Every structure is written in structure tokens, then in C-alpha cells.
Amino acid sequence: CCGPTACVAGCKPCC
């Protein structure tokens, strides 16, 4: 879910 970009829609809160 968390990667080089911000949290994307459809992902659980992880940032």
C-alpha cells in the first residue's frame, strides 16, 4: 500500500 507515492484510493490508511 505504502510506496513512493502517497496512499492511493482503495488502500487502507498506511501513511
Curated annotation (Swiss-Prot):
Keywords: Amidation, Disulfide bond, Hydroxylation, Secreted, Toxin. One of its GO terms (molecular function) is toxin activity. The modification 4-hydroxyproline is found at residues 4, 13. It is found in: Secreted. Disulfide bonds join 1-15, 2-11, 7-14. The modification Cysteine amide is found at residue 15. Belongs to the conotoxin M superfamily. This is Conotoxin SI.6. It comes from Conus textile (Cloth-of-gold cone).
